[in-house]
Amino acid sequence: VFTLNGFPYGGFHRQVVKDQVYAPDWSLKTRLRYTLRLTSILAELLPDEMEGSISTLPLSYKPWFQENQPIRANVFYKASIYIARVVAKMVRIRTETGKLLHLDLEPEPDGLIENAAEVVNYFKAHLLPIGGAYLAKYLEIPLAAATAFLLEHVRVCYDTCHFAVEYEDPISVFKQFEAAGIKVGKIQISA
């Protein structure tokens, strides 16, 4: 096993999915704890010679916060801290076992991160400054090292259907990510 789908929470088999697939979102400790458990499981199952990926939701569901910018800003803040905590665990696992794990954000329509521009903006405006400062303090390392860890362990799950629905050219998307130092950790071919 080299990849896990951490987007849906637990055993998700409801008749009507809609926005509930985003619950719990990255503003809640429940999502953090769930992802930390997935990280431990993948570290055990992952063959030594492979990288491991866990796909996850694009932070939250955008329509929940359309009219409330302060709450939306808080979601970006908490998500960045919680994702940095997952990265801290992934760094520890790599130090102890040599296994490289990464968390792959999966942008999609109506997600808090929908497209390439929003991915780049999230990394530049939230994850790297907020998550980087947290990770630097938590691991007692320089900010530059924390930033490098975030860029190594937080990537994008590129779903062909989701980006097609956003009318984004794949070459342009990959160039935007590369220019921002953001890696693609997983590609999902879907229609």
Language model: regions and residue ranges:
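Short glycine-enriched loops at secondary-structure junctions
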Residues: N5-G11, S60
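A short alpha/beta connector and helix-capping loop motif
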Residues: E166-A191
